[in-house]
A protein has these predicted regions:
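Integrase module of LTR retroelements
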Residues: 1-144
Length: 144
């Protein structure tokens, strides 16, 4: 990557306790150059359309459309709608494979760090961990 937010990685942290606002997962989106990240609270059952809306508002509106995205083979990232949308904005999709998991290694390390931070918050904040996610994101992005 030559410019920030040009190449990104993304994955989901799932299986979290449901919050009062019905969030039970976090969409982790990482800039592969600067290692900075966005932690977006979602519900695992959100449609791809809803995820595209969030992505447009939280990523594209702030950073522009990336040149390339590395992600796992989650069905949401493999859907026709997601692929067509990314093609329209000129973003290349790179799926990590079971044989080459290092392609998603950066997002996996970020997710592990996030999960460690979240464990403390979930214990302390119970059903409101999503309200504290911006502070966790700030702490993560200012810790290196």
């Amino acid at each position: 990557p030559e410019w920030k937010w040009e190449h990104i990685a993304m994955d989901f942290v799932v299986g979290l306790p449901k919050t009062k606002t019905n969030h039970d997962a976090i969409w982790v989106i990482i800039d592969r150059l600067t290692k900075s990240a966005h932690f977006l609270p979602i519900n695992e059952r959100y449609t791809v359309d809803r995820l595209v809306d969030i992505y447009m508002r939280e990523i594209v509106a702030q950073h522009g459309a990336p040149v390339a995205i590395v992600s796992d083979r989650d069905p949401r990232f493999n859907s026709r709608f997601w692929r067509s949308f990314q093609e329209c904005v000129g973003t290349k999709l790179n799926m990590s494979t079971a044989y080459h998991p290092q392609t998603a290694g950066q997002s996996e390390r970020t997710i592990q760090t996030l999960e460690d931070m979240l464990r403390v918050c979930v214990i302390d904040f119970k059903g409101t961990w999503d309200k504290h996610l911006p502070l966790i994101e700030f702490a993560y992005n200012n810790s290196y």
